[in-house]
Design a protein with these regions (language model features):
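FAD/FMN-dependent oxidoreductases across multiple families
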Residues: 227-310, 314-315
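A conserved beta-strand/loop capping segment in the N-terminal third of enzymes
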Residues: 54-105
């Protein structure tokens, strides 16, 4: 009998397991895959993610992988490049965009070090119930017999297509249409100047440095164009890239080091994150378009919130259901603005005149430009930046 079973050992599950194990709870951490391994997911460690890694004592391990700090963000929106410097507090060197085979290994190692019990290549097939309460899981290891494990709470950190969410019947509190598709790969022997974002009315590109001297270059567009794009990825990527001559020249001077990775399975959904004996964290409970790159940051924030709530309940400081209700309230309050922002950013078409005017005004002040790009990485509050007094000063 465990205090908690965490299903999924990636960016949401491993930190949740680590934090609970550090409080002395008996935690079973289950992962369908194995480590180290890359997965199709976001790379970005925005400021909230970097700050959590620092507080957990794991940032140095990420830096030790050789992933370079990112200190600059350039944004081209069909008009001109607007480049801002990133100013992170607490002496942090920058944000990072590590390969998941490195980041996920660091996170799962930290969970195991904290005494969580890890089982890799274990597929959860169903939940165990007593009345209306979840009391455990049923699943099997690779090639093994079906087994059952029981716990006070089962936490689903198993991503967008969460088995825990499905079996628990987690309702969608908010569901919006899929807006975009994405394809990306990695290049060697080229350069990027921090994060480079290029948006046109009908498609966009993104480039940034990652581990092993590689640079990720991504292209994305409206979801209704996905079928056509995937028929000839090379030709369509070249066509998009030609719209950014400087980036095209750098890509041409490099070498694509890995296969193309892409999907249009990018729904925008906010699920009920708890019920009797179960809870959700990370993409299992909240998935949004990746254009804002908030996924890992939200997973880390959610892991801390949920671990604190579960600890409060298991330790008897408050009823577990009450603690989980507070977790939901705080998660929803933070998630809704992110969901709204992601859906706006993922909607292609001409930019509003107000945004074009703001960009023109920002060209007159590097400090204001730095604050503007700071919103993208989590160091600046959009409410503060877009406050009437601040807009009046800038415009």
């Amino acid at each position: 009998m465990y205090d908690a079973i965490v299903v999924g050992a990636r960016c949401a599950g491993s930190p949740t397991a680590m934090l609970l194990a550090q409080q002395g709870y008996r935690v079973l951490l289950l992962e369908r895959g194995s480590f180290p391994s890359d997965i199709f997911r976001n790379h970005a460690l925005l400021y909230p993610a970097v700050a959590h890694l620092q507080s957990w004592g794991l940032l140095d391990a990420v830096i030790a992988t050789g992933c370079p700090p990112i200190t600059q963000f350039s944004q081209f929106m069909g008009d001109f490049n607007l480049t801002g410097k990133l100013h992170l507090p607490d002496g942090l060197a920058g944000i990072y965009a590590p390969r998941r085979k490195y980041l996920d290994q660091i996170l799962v190692d930290a969970a195991v070090k904290a005494s969580a019990e890890l089982r890799e290549e274990f597929a959860v097939q169903d939940l165990l119930w007593e009345g209306d309460r979840v009391v455990g899981v049923r699943g099997r290891s690779h090639g093994g017999a079906s087994v059952e494990e029981r716990a006070t709470i089962v936490i689903g950190a198993d991503g967008l297509h969460s088995v825990v969410a499905r079996c628990a019947g987690a309702a969608a509190l908010e569901s919006r249409p899929t807006l975009t598709w994405i394809y990306y790969s990695y290049w060697s022997d080229m350069t990027t100047a921090g994060v480079e974002f290029y948006r046109f009315d009908d498609e966009a590109m993104l480039a940034f440095p990652t581990n092993d001297g590689l640079h990720c270059v991504a292209t994305f567009g409206p979801v209704d164009g996905f079928s056509d794009y995937r028929t000839d990825i090379e030709a369509n990527f070249a066509r998009t890239l030609a719209r950014v001559p400087d980036l095209a020249a750098r890509v041409a001077g490099g070498r694509r080091a890995e296969r193309w990775i892409g999907t249009s399975d990018l729904p925008n959904v906010l699920r009920k994150p708890y019920g009797p004996g179960w809870a959700l964290v990370g993409d299992a409970g909240f998935h949004k378009d990746p254009v804002t790159a908030h996924g890992i940051s939200d997973a880390f924030v959610g892991a801390q919130l949920l671990a604190d709530a579960v600890d409060a309940g298991l330790a008897g400081r408050r009823p577990l259901a009450e603690a989980l209700a507070a977790y939901e309230a705080q998660r929803n309050a933070e998630a809704m603005p992110v969901l709204d922002g992601a859906c706006i950013a993922a909607t292609f078409g001409p930019l509003p005149a107000e945004m074009l005017g703001l960009r023109q005004a920002l060209r007159q002040s590097q400090d204001d430009t730095d604050q503007f790009v700071g919103m993208a990485v989590g160091t600046v509050s959009p409410m503060e930046f877009f406050a009437p007094a601040n807009m009046g000063r800038i415009m």
